[in-house]
Design a protein with these regions (language model features):
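TRAFAC-class small GTPase G-domain
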Residues: 1-213, 240
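Extreme C-terminal disordered tails of eukaryotic proteins encode short linear targeting/docking signals used
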Residues: 216-240
Length: 240
C-alpha cells in the first residue's frame, strides 16, 4: 500500500517537461533570446550578449515553472545547418520562430524559411509562435508590420505559384496552411533588453499545457506506473 501511495504522490506532484525549439535565420537573436530567458527564470544568469557567438549545432536551456519544466533547444540558423531542424520536430511540444524585425533586407529569406516550417507535417498541430525580435531598435518593424509583411509575401508567392503549371499543392493542404496563417500568433520582443520575453514564455506555458503530445517514452512510463499501481492495489485487496 505504501508503494501505491508513494507512486500516486510522485505522479501527482511530478513536473511535466516540454521541449521547445527556437529556430530562425542566423543573426535573428535566437541565442540571445535563450540566454535572456535563462537569466530571467534561473538563479544562474545566462551568457551576456558580448559572449554570444554564432550557433553551430545547438544550445540548450531549461527553466522550471509551476507544474512544468520547459526545455529549450536553440538550433543554428545558418543556411548549411538548417536541415537539422526537422530532426527535432517529432519530439517538440512548441516551436518559436525568431525573425529579425530590424533586418529588412533578409525578410524575404526569413519568410521563405518560415513558410517551409509551416509546411512541415510533423508540427502541423504543434503550437507555433512567431517572435518579431529587436524591438529595441528604432528602425524595427512593429508586430503588425511584421504580420502584414509576411501576409503580403505569402500572397505574392501564391499568385506566382498559380501561374506555374508545376504548382500542385492540394486544396486540403492549402486550406490547412491558410488556417494556420490566420491563427498565427505574433509577439514583439527585445531579446537584448528582455522586453516581451516573459509574455512569450507565458504564451508557451499555456499552449504546451493545452496541446500535449504523448511520446513513446511518456506512454511507457504511464503504462509502467499504472501496472505497478494495479499490482500493489491487487495485493492490498487480496490481503483485506
Amino acid at each position: 500500500m505504501y508503494h501505491l501511495l508513494k507512486g500516486l504522490h510522485e505522479y501527482l506532484t511530478r513536473k511535466e517537461e516540454f521541449s521547445v525549439i527556437i529556430i530562425g535565420l542566423d543573426g535573428a537573436g535566437k541565442t540571445t533570446l535563450l540566454e535572456k530567458i535563462k537569466t530571467l527564470y534561473n538563479d544562474t544568469p545566462g551568457l551576456s550578449p558580448d559572449k554570444i557567438g554564432p550557433t553551430v549545432g545547438q544550445n540548450t536551456g531549461k527553466i522550471t515553472l509551476p507544474s512544468t519544466i520547459l526545455q529549450f533547444w536553440d538550433l543554428g540558423g545558418q543556411r548549411g545547418i538548417r536541415n537539422i531542424w526537422s530532426k527535432y520536430y517529432d519530439d517538440c511540444h512548441a516551436v518559436v520562430y525568431v525573425i529579425d524585425a530590424d533586418d529588412r533586407e533578409r525578410l524575404g529569406e526569413g519568410w521563405e524559411v518560415f513558410d517551409s516550417v509551416l509546411s512541415a507535417p510533423q508540427i502541423l498541430n504543434v503550437p507555433l509562435l512567431l517572435l518579431a525580435n529587436k524591438q529595441d531598435s528604432p528602425m524595427s518593424l512593429s508586430v503588425e508590420e511584421i504580420r502584414h509583411d509576411y501576409e503580403d509575401w505569402h500572397q505574392r508567392k501564391l499568385e506566382s505559384a498559380r501561374r506555374d503549371t508545376r504548382y500542385a499543392e492540394g486544396d486540403n493542404e492549402m486550406s490547412a496552411r491558410r488556417e494556420r496563417i490566420a491563427s498565427l500568433d505574433v509577439m514583439g520582443v527585445s531579446a537584448l533588453e528582455g522586453t516581451g520575453v516573459r509574455p512569450a514564455v507565458d504564451w508557451l506555458f499555456i499552449r504546451v499545457q493545452n496541446s500535449r503530445r504523448l511520446f513513446p517514452h511518456t506512454l511507457c512510463w504511464m503504462i509502467r506506473a499504472h501496472s505497478s499501481s494495479s499490482r500493489e492495489a491487487q495485493k492490498y485487496i487480496s490481503k483485506s
